[in-house]
């Protein structure tokens, strides 16, 4: 029974590493220990956060007054939602929870950055 549990844990760890390694910058794989994977996901999230900030600033410049106010409100609420949503994963059990939470932050931040990058195409 112990061998089965150890084998299952190893498979889950490898699957998580493979999943994390497929995300974001193709040149950067999030392989290694849990700590290394979490640090890698944090670095990728920081890259996407920078892109999101730049896109947000550009969208604010491009928007009219009413749109700017609404975008500011939406962005603040989106950040609260992202943080609360990813905290759900972080509160899970085991070390996989830290990886799941890191991937949640990375993927949601990437999606929002891409959405804001396309925002200028929808205004006017």
Model-predicted segments: where are they?
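Bacterial N-terminal signal peptides that target proteins for export
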Residues: 1-8
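N-terminal alpha-helical modules
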Residues: 19-124
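N-terminal signal peptide c-region/cleavage motif recognized by signal peptidases
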Residues: 14-18
